[in-house]
Structures are given as structure tokens and as C-alpha cells.
């Protein structure tokens, strides 16, 4: 199941920022739009799509991952095909809304929820592995899209992406996914099956409304939002921040490689830790890693320290996703995990959408991007303190 979920996660690539970025200049030239107009259309589409995440999550809970992912895959293929027809900024915003809603949002959610249902004791490591495989695969997507654009043009490239989704994500979802282990007479983690005359163990299943009244949900939301806000801002303005210490655009772009390595290491390590007793301290640790990243971003000048900053930023991003994915079902069960994940996803996307603007304003207020990074480090430090004080609201794992 981890392999299938990872594959579907990779197939969301054309709807992720890393995939859309390949089309940016071609959209600008082909539609005669400025970079600002394209960025605004992307922001509007992303923000509007985020508001649907809780509803999508509830529907996933109602119909199951298999059916939901199949529908989302087919709809995603259609929206990608629609991108080949766009004309003008408004139409482009509508297209961005569709691919962000279905690719970055819905399909990504079902791929994560599917793993949550199939693992309990080893859920953290399984989610960390899924994230690692997905990130590795998505990193290839821009290369393939760029080759398609060079060969056929950007409009045909959208159609090619739609075709790939239609012949892969849809059949994988329908024929590969199984909603729950019990549907095959199995149990999470591959444990022994339950005899017919024995009741299935009942795990706590908390509704979305109950979760929203939990302090743990809002602490985890604060960690997720802070990670999304500042992580996105640092990534978006990487050339600006590193340019202040003399790095060229090419040199700054090269630092994405240690960030990718850090994200893989962070996802696997924190996913493994999430299955152990230390997991109730992980939200605070994630916030501390982000604070350390921002302090390094404001002080690093030599190549070793810039390399350390880049790797630490990747660790912050990878660890945040692994901790969020593993703690949600540990806190609230899996009965309503789709709607709860959708609500947390809404918070994360909204924060992410404001990341670039926050650092732009910060550079004006504080005089530079490096200074802004230093001052903004105060917030994750406060979030880390809050998460440490209220760590008792997070479940311990006494088995390891």
C-alpha cells in the first residue's frame, strides 16, 4: 500500500508548485501575461482551492479512499487537459484552481489517508517512507514536463500530463487501493487476523468537531502553519536571501539539492521517531528545527554554513510533514481522518500562500531578507515553547 500511495503521490506532480513552475515562462509568453499576473492567478486559485479541503476530506471518509481517489484521478486528468485551452488571466486562475484542488489537495490527501488506515504501530515510519518516495519521484516530474514542452509545446505538454494521469492514477486507485485492511480480512501492520467469532478491536475515532475542541489539534496546527508560512517564504525567496551574501541565481538554485536530501532525512527520521516514546515532544522539536533554520538563514555567510542552512531547511520541511501525518491518527483515530486532515490542510495551504508575501514585506520592514529571517525566528521559538508546555496533550507510545 505504501508503494501504491507513493506512486499516486508522485502523479500529483503536475498540480504541485514544482511542476507548475516549469510552465511559468511559457504561460507568460503564450498568454502575454506578466509574472505578477501569473503569480496572482496562482495565488487566487490556490487560496480558493484550499477552502474545499475539509469538504473533500469528509467525502473521503464517507465513500472510502478507493472510490474517492479514482474520481479525483479522473477529474485531475480532465483539469490538466483543460489547462491546454486557457486564454487570459481569469481563465488561467480557474485552471490553477482545478489542478491545485485535485492534484495538490485531493489526490495528495487520499494517498496519505490510505497509508494511515493500513498502519498503526509503524504508521510514522510508513508515512515517512511514503513521503520520501513521493518527494523523490516528484523531483523528476519537472524534468519530464520540461522535455515534453521542448518536444511538443506547452499546450500539448498539459495534454500529455493528462493522459499519463488517466492511464496510471485512475486504474491504480480503482484496482490497487483497498480502503481498510479489514476488507481483506487483515489488520493494520500485517498483524494476525481476527477470528469470525471475535470482535474487531475498536480504536478511538474522534469527529472533526471534537478534534477542533482539542488543544492538541491547535498546537499541531500552529506548528504546521508556521512551518508552511516560513518554509515557503524561504524557498520562494532563496535567490534573494542567498544573493545578499553574493550567491548567483545558479548557485542559490544548487542549494535545492541539499534541501532535498535534508527533506528525505527529516521525513524518514521523524517518521521513525513518531512510532516511539519521544513522539509527544516532536511538535516542539519541529518548531525548534525551523527556528534554527531561520537563525542560520540570517547569519550564514560561508559555504559550510550555507550548506548547513539548506540541509536544515529541508529537514524542517520533511519532519513537519511526517509528524503531522503520524500524530493526527494517533490523536483522533482514522474514522474521520479525512475531514480532520482536510481542515489541517486548509490551515497549511493558507499559511503557505502567505509565505512569499510575508518575507517580501519583512525585507522592506527589516531592511533585508536575512534580517527578516532573524526576526521571524522569534515565532517558531514561541511555538516550540507552547508545544513543549502542552506536550501532555499528545499521546505517548509506551511500546518502544
Residues covered by each model-derived region:
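A late C-terminal transmembrane helix in Major Facilitator Superfamily
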Residues: 129, 138, 331-366
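Helix-to-loop junctions at the C-terminal end of transmembrane segments
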Residues: 51-65, 266-278, 364
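Helix-loop-helix hairpin linking two adjacent transmembrane segments in secondary transporters
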Residues: 133-181
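Extracytoplasmic gate region of multi-pass secondary transporters
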Residues: 16, 20-24, 209-267
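Extracytoplasmic
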Residues: 1-35, 53-56, 142, 234-239
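Structural signature of the two symmetry-related core transmembrane helices
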Residues: 67-81, 281-295
Amino acid at each position: 500500500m505504501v508503494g501504491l500511495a507513493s506512486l499516486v503521490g508522485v502523479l500529483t506532480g503536475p498540480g504541485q508548485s514544482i511542476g507548475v513552475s516549469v510552465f511559468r515562462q511559457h504561460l507568460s509568453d503564450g498568454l502575454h501575461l506578466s509574472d505578477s499576473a501569473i503569480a496572482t492567478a496562482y495565488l487566487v486559485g490556490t487560496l480558493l482551492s484550499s477552502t474545499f479541503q475539509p469538504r473533500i476530506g469528509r467525502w473521503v471518509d464517507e465513500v472510502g479512499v478507493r472510490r474517492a481517489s479514482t474520481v479525483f484521478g479522473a477529474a485531475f486528468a480532465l483539469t490538466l487537459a483543460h489547462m491546454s485551452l486557457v486564454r487570459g488571466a481569469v481563465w488561467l486562475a480557474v485552471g490553477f484552481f482545478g489542478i491545485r484542488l485535485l492534484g495538490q489537495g485531493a489526490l495528495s490527501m487520499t494517498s496519505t489517508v490510505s497509508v494511515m488506515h493500513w498502519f498503526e504501530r509503524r504508521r510514522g515510519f510508513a508515512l515517512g517512507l511514503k513521503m520520501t518516495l513521493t518527494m523523490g519521484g516528484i523531483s523528476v516530474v519537472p524534468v519530464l514536463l520540461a522535455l515534453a514542452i521542448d518536444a511538443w509545446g506547452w499546450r500539448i505538454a498539459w495534454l500529455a500530463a493528462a493522459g499519463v494521469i488517466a492511464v496510471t492514477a485512475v486504474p491504480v486507485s480503482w484496482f490497487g487501493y483497498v480502503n481498510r485492511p479489514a476488507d481483506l480480512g487483515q489488520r493494520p501492520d500485517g498483524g494476525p487476523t481476527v477470528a469470525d467469532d471475535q470482535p474487531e478491536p475498536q480504536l478511538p475515532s474522534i469527529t472533526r468537531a471534537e478534534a477542533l475542541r482539542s488543544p492538541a489539534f491547535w498546537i499541531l496546527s500552529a506548528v504546521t502553519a508556521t512551518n508552511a508560512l516560513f518554509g515557503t517564504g524561504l524557498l520562494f525567496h532563496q535567490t534573494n536571501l542567498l544573493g545578499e551574501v553574493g550567491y548567483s541565481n545558479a548557485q542559490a538554485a544548487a542549494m535545492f539539492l541539499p534541501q532535498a536530501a535534508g527533506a528525505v532525512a527529516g521525513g524518514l527520521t521523524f517518521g521513525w521517531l513518531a512510532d516511539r516514546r519521544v513522539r509527544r515532544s516532536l511538535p516542539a522539536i519541529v518548531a525548534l528545527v525551523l527556528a534554527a533554520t531561520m537563525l542560520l538563514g540570517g547569519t550564514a555567510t560561508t559555504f559550510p554554513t550555507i550548506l548547513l542552512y539548506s540541509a536544515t531547511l529541508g529537514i524542517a520541511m520533511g519532519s513537519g510533514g511526517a509528524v503531522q501525518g503520524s500524530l493526527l491518527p494517533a490523536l483522533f483515530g482514522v474514522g474521520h481522518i479525512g475531514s480532520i486532515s482536510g481542515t489541517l490542510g486548509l490551515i497549511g495551504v493558507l499559511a503557505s500562500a502567505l509565505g512569499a508575501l510575508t518575507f517580501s514585506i519583512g525585507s522592506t520592514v527589516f531592511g533585508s531578507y536575512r534580517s527578516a529571517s532573524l526576526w521571524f525566528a522569534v515565532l517558531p521559538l514561541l511555538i516550540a515553547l507552547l508545544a513543549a508546555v502542552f506536550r501532555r496533550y499528545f499521546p505517548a507510545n509506551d511500546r518502544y
